A protein has these predicted regions:
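Transmembrane helix-boundary elements of multi-pass transport/secretion proteins
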Residues: 3-77, 86-106, 112-131, 153-157, ...
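Hydrophobic alpha-helical transmembrane segments of integral membrane proteins
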Residues: 14-16, 44-45, 79, 161-162, ...
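Hydrophobic transmembrane alpha-helices
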Residues: 50-57, 98, 132-136, 158-169, ...
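Residue-level signal for transmembrane alpha-helical positions in Major Facilitator Superfamily
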Residues: 59, 103, 107, 137, ...
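Extended hydrophobic-aromatic, low-complexity segments
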Residues: 122-123, 138-139, 154-158, 170, ...
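Transmembrane-helix boundary motif in ABC transporter permease subunits
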Residues: 138-151, 233
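Short hydrophobic, aromatic-rich alpha-helical segments embedded in or entering the lipid bilayer
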Residues: 175-216
Length: 241
């Protein structure tokens, strides 16, 4: 899996170049004018949410489409004929996609901090840990979603269905506390809600892993990754049953 993706230039471009280009545009728009009272730009405040969103979006799309190729090409069927258990198979795919997911997360974080020169507080190690847990969940979700698509076009059609509600309800555009009660309750089902909240707590408030709220959000992200990985394994069982 790693060798196959490494040889795909379009995949590398999607993972590395695309986030950098989009972040550059965002930085050009919101990274110049600072508040004279605080010295912070709009980008400084948006950075935690943007880091979470771009890390989640690109790797979710990649894993859904790539795993669908494994299904349609017969590769998955051949692997299922081996003594590997389905849980072990999903774990192998998670490791394969996870390597690229972590690379992308590192690129996004490094570019945001070093190239866009945002102001931040807290530990970058903690920021990367939150990113890492989030992208593992994104990979697991992509693997699970691929079971419901018959071709790449259908897989791509799941992207707005899954991501658009999170764009509006996770705190990316509007703080979750300002949402109506029903929408605020709905936001609790989205992983980006917890990732954005945890990243803001670290990068804006300067909190660390000793804070119980950050630990709770991390725990929820871990649980999300486990649930979606289990769903991905279950989808394979249904497929071959």
């Amino acid at each position: 899996m790693i060798l196959q993706l490494r040889g795909d230039r379009r995949t590398i471009a999607l993972l590395v170049v695309a986030p950098v280009v989009v972040l550059s545009l965002v930085g050009a728009i919101w990274g110049r004018q600072a508040d004279p009272r605080t010295g912070r730009t709009i980008l400084d405040d948006l950075a935690p949410a943007l880091i979470a969103f771009f890390a989640f979006f690109f790797i979710f799309l990649l894993s859904a489409v790539a795993f669908l190729r494994e299904r349609t090409s017969g590769t998955l069927e051949r692997l299922l004929a081996t003594p590997l258990r389905r849980g072990e198979l999903i774990a192998g795919y998670l490791v394969g996609f996870g390597v690229f997911a972590l690379l992308q997360a590192l690129v996004i974080l490094a570019f945001t901090v070093l190239a866009l020169k945002i102001q931040y507080r807290g530990s970058l190690g903690t920021v990367f840990l939150i990113e890492a847990v989030l992208v593992v969940g994104a990979v697991s979700l992509g693997l699970a979603v691929s079971a419901f698509a018959r071709n790449e076009l259908q897989a791509v059609q799941f992207v707005p269905l899954i991501l658009l509600p999170q764009v509006f309800l996770s705190g990316l555009l509007v703080p979750v506390d300002e949402l109506p009660d029903g929408l605020r309750q709905a936001s609790a089902f989205f992983p980006l809600t917890y990732a954005i909240r945890a990243l803001r707590a670290v990068m804006v408030a300067g909190l660390g892993l000793d804070d119980p709220l950050i630990l709770r959000d991390l725990g929820i992200l871990v649980a999300f990754a486990l649930v979606t990985a289990t769903a991905a394994a279950a989808s394979i069982r249904r497929e071959v049953a």
